[in-house]
Amino acid sequence: MNKKIGITLGDPAGIGPELILKISKHFKEKFTYVIYGEEKTLLEASKLTGIKLNYKKIEKVEEAKERGVYLIDLNVLKVPVVEPSVSSGKAAVAYLARAVADAIRGNIHGILTMPINKFWAKKAGFQYEGQTEFLAKASGTKDYAMMMYSEKLKVVLLTTHIPLKDVPNYVKKEEILKKVRLIRKEFLEKFKFEPLIKVLGLNPHAGEMGELGREEIEEIIPAVEEAKKEGIKVVGPLVPDVAFINPSEEDVFLCMYHDQGLIPFKMLAFDEGVNFTLGLPFIRTSPDHGTAYDIAWKNKARESSSLHALRLIEDLLDKI
């Protein structure tokens, strides 16, 4: 099987082009890599980094019949390097859309998406909160979740980009159950092991028996108990301020809101963190950072997170 990995350029005004060149030094002969972007932009990034990437230009991914590195040049930009703008946002969306279309058809088996900027993407007509939501909609995926992954720590979020004051409205038994079931299904199918799912409480001290909040008693505990009846390895609600001490490799933490999960994750695994989308019909990862316009096109970007994101795709494809 010729296992193909798609890599999107991301926002060309950001650090994506530079990162692709830097991780290309670690490409493996047993995989096929298909870059979705701009040849002229990659050539400029090559001059910047001093890294030469040998690739073959193709029009369609089906032409990538032999193992190697390929480029689908969408030729969206008029110039190689642009400032953050509607043009850069439009280009980033075009690269993503083409890669996703190929993945949905089964022509690539995993996608590494370089960062896009939500502001400029939306200015260019992108109508989604982020790449994850676009991937889910395009693939017809109803149940999905963002997981931050590293060998040290694995964190799944019940809620993502919503105001903290609104979080309790989403801490519901059925929503928790959906995420717990999804985590188990994805780990069994893609990671090939049974996870221990650790569900965190919402309130300080996990509610202190209802004295500090009722969500644990009314929503979280019933969800955990029902999941146990289904044979799922799950515990909770755990007290959030001690839950992350000495995690094991099989632990997956289900956190109630964004910062509850992301603060400990970035403290423990900042340079090796990977954004993994659970629930999609293909593997999708991205680095754990944004476009970093402030250091873009200065050859200052560190490729560690992007390399870990690539390695995770490769490792999972090895399990197929």
Swiss-Prot record:
Cofactor: a divalent metal cation
Main location: cytoplasm
GO MF term (any one): NAD binding
Pathway: Cofactor biosynthesis; pyridoxine 5'-phosphate biosynthesis; pyridoxine 5'-phosphate from D-erythrose 4-phosphate: step 4/5
Catalytic activity, EC: 1.1.1.262
Gene3D superfamilies: Isopropylmalate Dehydrogenase
Binding-site positions, a divalent metal cation: 161, 205, 258
UniProt KW ATP-binding keyword: no
InterPro entries: PdxA_fam
Chemical reaction(s) catalysed: 4-(phosphooxy)-L-threonine + NAD(+) = 3-amino-2-oxopropyl phosphate + CO2 + NADH
Signal peptide location: none
Cofactor, how bound (note): Binds 1 divalent metal cation per subunit.
SUPFAM superfamilies assigned to the protein according to its UniProt record, in alphabetical order: Isocitrate/Isopropylmalate dehydrogenase-like
Gene Ontology CC annotations of this record: cytoplasm
Residues involved in substrate binding: 132, 266, 275, 284
UniProt cross-references to Pfam families, sorted A to Z: PdxA
Keywords for the protein's UniProt record, in alphabetical order: Cytoplasm, Metal-binding, NAD, NADP, Oxidoreductase, Pyridoxine biosynthesis
Subcellular location, record wording: Cytoplasm
Biological function: Catalyzes the NAD(P)-dependent oxidation of 4-(phosphooxy)-L-threonine (HTP) into 2-amino-3-oxo-4-(phosphooxy)butyric acid which spontaneously decarboxylates to form 3-amino-2-oxopropyl phosphate (AHAP).
Miscellaneous: The active site is located at the dimer interface.
Complex formation: Homodimer.
The protein's name: 4-hydroxythreonine-4-phosphate dehydrogenase
Organism expressing this protein natively: Aquifex aeolicus (strain VF5)
